[in-house]
From Swiss-Prot:
Gene: dus
Superkingdom field: Bacteria
Protein role: Catalyzes the synthesis of 5,6-dihydrouridine (D), a modified base found in the D-loop of most tRNAs, via the reduction of the C5-C6 double bond in target uridines.
Annotated residues for binding of FMN: P25, V26, A27, Q79, K154, S219, G220, D221, A243, R244
Protein name as it appears in the record: Probable tRNA-dihydrouridine synthase
One Pfam family it belongs to: Dus
Protein species of origin: Treponema pallidum (strain Nichols)
């Protein structure tokens, strides 16, 4: 595949996107603050963290906050999880009415026991029949309200190595009305250990071509722009979804676009990292308040400082920061050229 063709527009049903480098849903990170930063650094498409269908129908205030669109999000997807088709359908209708997202994504890939024990997340990949019922209910509900909003599904390779059900799950999702698929090619048993098997993504791409040219997006072991290029070349997937690789590193989206289109990318300075962290803190505070934002930002600051000399000292202070002033002091000491 020619390098210039690796970065390109993509369509998910009626939804047209200018690029194919996405920010995946990440629990505890994919809030509107970080999504906004990711968009500033050229993420082509962004997803909310997964939203509980049960909490949504209970009218949870926290859940309503999770689905809020960032101010600079032209397009975004809301990811929902659950195992009850009726509840999932009701959740989808509520979301379409209240948030008007560009896409609704169904989580059939989360490996966390607290999710799978309810029959949701990766447990749906293990049970293609149940997945079909969930996707069909959601798709029917969404398309009846607004046919411009595609329903998509993210799956895993399977429950364990001896039971790889990705093909059956993917086909069930498409037959039920899903207009795109995303695949994390690890099993639920692996969680995030070991290597992601990109060969499975390539196999799914081939299968999906026979199901009506359904686009397939890949995730797993994407930690650098070079990883994205390698996945696109190896699998011929329609696009890539950065998850953990984007934590504290929203710059990876622009760098990946540069690598795919120009063959090189511009390194990010420590000052740029700290300025992005400071901006994220303030965006987060607009949503949850200064105190809560500072608590959440502690671990995120550590991610921003990854790979920098002297990070241990700054991070030790950052994990105890409880105010804007505390973070400003840490940032000024780490990079005096930043005038805060």
């Amino acid at each position: 595949m020619q390098q210039h063709a690796l970065y390109h527009p993509v369509s998910i049903g009626p939804l047209s996107l200018k690029g194919n480098v996405f920010f995946a849903p990440v629990a505890g990170y994919s809030d509107s603050a970080f999504r906004s930063i990711a968009i500033e650094w050229e993420a082509s498409f962004t997803y909310t963290e997964m939203v509980s269908s049960e909490a949504m129908v209970r009218d949870s205030l926290n859940t309503k906050r999770l689905i809020r669109r960032a101010s600079n999000e032209t397009h975004y997807a809301i990811q929902i999880f659950g195992s009850n088709p009726a509840v999932m359908a009701e959740t989808a209708k509520l979301i379409v009415d209240s948030a008007q997202p560009s896409c609704i994504d169904i989580n059939a890939g989360c490996p966390m026991p607290k999710i799978t024990k309810t029959g949701a997340g990766a447990a749906l990949t293990r049970e293609p029949t149940r997945l079909y019922e969930v996707v069909k209910a959601v798709a029917d509900a969404v398309y009846a309200q607004d046919a411009r909003i595609p329903v998509t599904v993210k799956i895993r390779a399977g429950w364990e190595e001896a039971h790889l059900t990705w093909k059956e799950a993917a086909r069930a999702a498409v037959d039920a009305g899903a207009q795109a698929l995303a695949l994390h090619p690890r099993t639920c048993a692996q969680c995030y250990a070991g290597e992601a098997n990109w060969d499975i993504i390539a196999d799914l791409v081939q299968c999906a071509r026979g199901w009506g040219e359904v686009p397939v997006f890949g995730s797993g072991d994407l930690h650098a722009p070079e990883d994205a290029r390698a996945m696109l070349e190896h699998t011929a997937c329609a696009g890539v979804m950065f998850a953990r690789g984007a934590m504290g590193n929203p710059f990876i989206f622009r760098q990946t676009r540069q690598l795919l289109t120009e063959g090189y990318y511009t390194p990010v300075t420590f000052e740029q990292k700290l300025r992005a962290a400071w901006r994220e803190l303030h965006l987060l505070a607009q949503d949850v308040g200064e105190s809560s934002a500072c608590k959440q930002m502690r671990k995120r600051f550590v991610s921003y400082a990854k790979g920098e000399r002297g990070k241990t000292q700054w991070c030790q202070r950052a994990v105890h920061a409880s105010s804007f002033a505390d973070f400003a002091a840490v940032i000024r000491d780490a990079c005096p050229c930043i005038g805060l």
